[in-house]
Amino acid sequence: GDVYKRQTVMFEDKEEKGREEIIDYALKLSRAGLNVNSSGNLSVRFDSPEGKGFLITPTGLPYDETEPEDLVRILFTDNGCYKAVGSRQPSSEWNLHAFLYQARPDINAVVHTHSPYATMLSCLDEAIPPFHYMVAAVGGDTLPCAPYATFGSVALAEGCRDTLGKDRLGCLLSHHGSVAAGRNLKQAYAVALEIESLARMWMNLKQIGGCPLIDKEEMARVKEQFKTYGQQEKGHEEG
């Protein structure tokens, strides 16, 4: 089984920064209305001398009561299992985060929320269609819904991993909520906000019978456009 052990509250600077960043974004999620109390969870990929793995929020602890030392480190082991290191138990959804990190080297942060509109739409068990070009910002021409499975289960983690595939950064989780990922927490948080915004708009449109959709060819062009979005600004910053 998982091994838990007490760890000191002193961390290397890089790890301390990562722990503080997770708490900062957890509080941002709460302020934005995307999570309530201890619902949802966040993680950041983190490799240490002890091994490769990630830092994740603990289970059952409200974000405004969470301290950096409360976060749990999950280590990937050589035999394909996982080892949890910390004074608390990790989020019940740690499997979901682990499966995404191991399947997608491009993902360095994961945010899981129970935001209101995304959660309502997830209960319809259907994808958000390409009603707006920003659907492509999450990586596809639709925003899919992963099949239902019990929270915290391997089946849920597998379903989420398979639904995201090779390039999507987010999806709904049937009768549950949503998952957002990114190259860092800033991007994962932005994706979580975008999913909730799209869900809110689509929910309102469904009340009046929906709307015309953008075709696959145009969504493909939008996806290509997003690949270079912001690169010019980045070039100016580096120049």
Give residue ranges: language-model regions.
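Short, small-residue-biased leader/transition segments that mark boundaries at the very start
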Residues: 1-4
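Glycine-rich flexible loops
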Residues: 6-239
